[in-house]
A protein has these predicted regions:
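Short, Lys/Arg-rich flexible segments
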Residues: 1-147
Length: 147
């Protein structure tokens, strides 16, 4: 039988992960932009093509791209006192002459409807999640070793 005793001081562990959370927000945002440029959903699948009438109206054939707001996500940064980074297309900004926000429109596209195919464009891809978890795990391991 092997036994081991380890002492460490919990007060030495820095639980401020705001830097890592902000980096995670940037990883998600960059991954999101890259996927939409390729026309891929959050699972890496090709999204449903646009209808001919939509292409004619927009003047181009890029899914979920009009103003750029849906692909250029906003990252509300984490701080030492607020350990949360929020990533969204826009929760406050409304479309001109409307009460509808970018998040509202994003939800509509995410769910789809009878005349709009479901396009699961928003979320965290497996690749981004893996990279984020690895980064945060390494940081926590470093803090525990230093304690």
């Amino acid at each position: 039988m092997i036994s081991m005793k380890a002492d460490f001081n919990l007060k030495k562990i820095n639980l401020d992960l705001s830097k890592e959370l902000n980096l995670a927000g940037q990883i998600i945002s960059k991954d999101h932009f890259t996927r939409l440029e390729k026309g891929q959903d959050v699972y890496g699948r090709q999204m449903a093509d646009l209808e001919d009438a939509t292409i004619e109206k927009k003047g181009f054939n890029q899914i979920l791209v009009n103003s750029g707001k849906m692909r250029n996500l906003i990252v509300d940064k984490a701080t030492k006192t607020k350990q949360e980074a929020l990533v969204h297309p826009g929760e406050k900004q409304k479309y001109k002459n409307s009460k509808v926000t970018m998040s509202d429109v994003g939800g509509f596209h995410q769910r789809g409807s009878s005349n709009l195919p479901k396009r699961e464009w928003f979320g965290i891809s497996t690749e981004a999640e893996t990279n984020i978890l690895k980064m945060i795990s390494q940081r926590i391991d470093r803090e525990i070793r230093r304690a």
